């Protein structure tokens, strides 16, 4: 295989390598989204919201909540977290939850409850970049396209 042609193909199709890598690591992306929510942060790096009931906040913290005292983490029963998904279609990545409370929570706290802030993007990139490199290596080794 001609190295120049291979490199040109990679350059022209880098989006495909990246999207395939995101599909391959979508479960880890979902996990990173949950990790971000557990500390009570939204996609902008701000707190999701504040709990209005101080006693409830103390009970949540006593149960092992990771978020700072009084910060919303969107976790009560765990159903909302369990239903979080990451879906890649074409060049669009959707992170959401199939739980029935999703619309209510988005209206209350904003659609920015989904999506990674800069800190958690870095955490996810630590997973994603090696996968992109792996796909490129496979292509260079045996012509396996994403």
Mark where each language-model region is.
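Short, Lys/Arg-rich flexible segments
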Residues: 1-146
């Amino acid at each position: 295989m001609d190295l120049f042609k291979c490199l040109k193909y990679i350059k022209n199709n880098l989006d495909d390598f990246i999207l395939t890598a995101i599909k391959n690591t979508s479960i880890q992306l979902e996990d990173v989204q949950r990790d971000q929510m557990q500390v009570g942060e939204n996609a902008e790096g701000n707190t999701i919201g504040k709990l209005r009931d101080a006693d409830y906040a103390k009970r949540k913290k006593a149960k092992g909540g990771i978020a700072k005292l009084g910060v919303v983490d969107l976790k009560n029963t765990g159903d909302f977290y369990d239903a979080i998904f990451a879906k890649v279609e074409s060049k669009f990545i959707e992170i959401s939850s199939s739980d029935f409370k999703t619309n209510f929570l988005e209206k209350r706290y904003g659609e920015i409850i989904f999506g990674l802030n800069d800190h958690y993007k870095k955490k996810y990139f630590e997973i994603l970049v090696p996968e992109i490199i792996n796909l490129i290596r496979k292509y260079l080794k045996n012509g396996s396209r994403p």
